[in-house]
C-alpha cells in the first residue's frame, strides 16, 4: 500500500541506503530483522522458559546451596560477553589502528575477568561468590554494572559486599538501566 511505499522511500533516502533500490533496501532490512530475531531468540526460549535450567550442565552446582563456593567454568567470553568487554574498555582500553582513544585508567588498571552474570542470568549466589573470589584474588575495585528488581538471596550479596569493604575494596555499583527512581523502586544490589 502507499504507507509501505512511503516507508521504503524514506529508507532509501538514509545515507547508508543512497543509491540502492527499494528491493535492495528491503533485502537489507530482512537481514537485520533475521539478525535481531536470532539475537533475542535465547531470551524467548531460555530466559522466559521457567523449565529451562542450564546450571546443572554448565555450572555444575546446586543453586539453592549457598555454602558451595567452588563451581563454574573458565568460559568468561560466552555467547554475549560484550557488556563486560565494553566496560573494561572504558576503564583500561588502549587505542587500536587509527583510533586514539584510551580508557580512563589505562596506565594503572589491570583487569580481572570474573563473569558472574552470564547472558543476564543474575543469581545472588553467583554474585556473592564472584565478589569474594575477586577480593581474595587481589582486586582493589569491583565494577558491578548489573542489577535487578528482585533479590531473593540479597543477604548473601550484602555479606559479600561487607567482606569486600573490610578488605578495603571499592565497589562501583550500577543504579540501573531502566530509568527508575531507586529511591522509590528497589534495585539490587544498589539499595
Language-model features: locations:
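Sec-exported extracytoplasmic/periplasmic mature domains
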Residues: 92-96, 132-140, 162-166, 176
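Subtilisin-like serine protease catalytic core
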Residues: 1-124
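Loop/turn elements at helix/coil->beta-strand transitions in domains of secreted/extracellular proteins
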Residues: 107-112, 136-142, 165-171
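Structural motif
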Residues: 103, 134, 187-190
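Acidic side chains
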Residues: 86, 103, 136-137, 181
Amino acid at each position: 500500500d502507499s504507507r509501505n511505499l512511503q516507508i521504503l522511500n524514506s529508507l532509501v533516502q538514509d545515507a547508508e541506503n543512497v543509491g540502492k533500490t527499494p528491493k535492495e533496501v528491503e533485502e537489507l532490512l530482512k537481514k537485520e530483522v533475521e539478525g535481531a530475531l536470532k539475537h533475542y531468540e535465547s531470551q524467548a526460549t531460555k530466559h522466559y522458559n521457567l523449565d529451562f535450567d542450564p546450571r546443572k550442565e554448565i555450572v555444575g552446582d546446586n543453586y539453592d546451596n549457598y555454602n558451595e563456593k567452588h563451581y563454574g567454568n573458565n568460559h568468561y567470553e560466552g555467547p554475549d560477553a560484550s557488556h563486560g568487554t565494553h566496560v573494561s574498555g572504558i576503564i583500561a582500553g588502549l587505542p587500536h589502528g587509527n583510533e586514539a582513544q584510551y580508557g580512563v585508567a589505562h596506565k594503572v588498571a589491570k583487569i580481572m575477568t570474573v563473569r558472574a552474570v552470564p547472558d543476564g542470568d543474575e543469581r545472588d549466589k553467583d554474585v556473592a561468590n564472584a565478589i569474594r573470589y575477586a577480593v581474595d584474588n587481589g582486586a582493589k575495585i569491583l565494577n558491578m554494572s548489573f542489577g535487578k528488581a528482585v533479590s531473593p538471596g540479597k543477604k548473601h550479596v550484602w555479606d559479600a559486599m561487607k567482606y569486600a569493604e573490610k578488605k578495603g575494596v571499592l565497589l562501583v555499583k550500577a543504579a540501573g538501566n531502566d530509568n527508575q527512581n531507586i529511591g522509590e523502586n528497589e534495585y539490587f544490589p544498589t539499595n
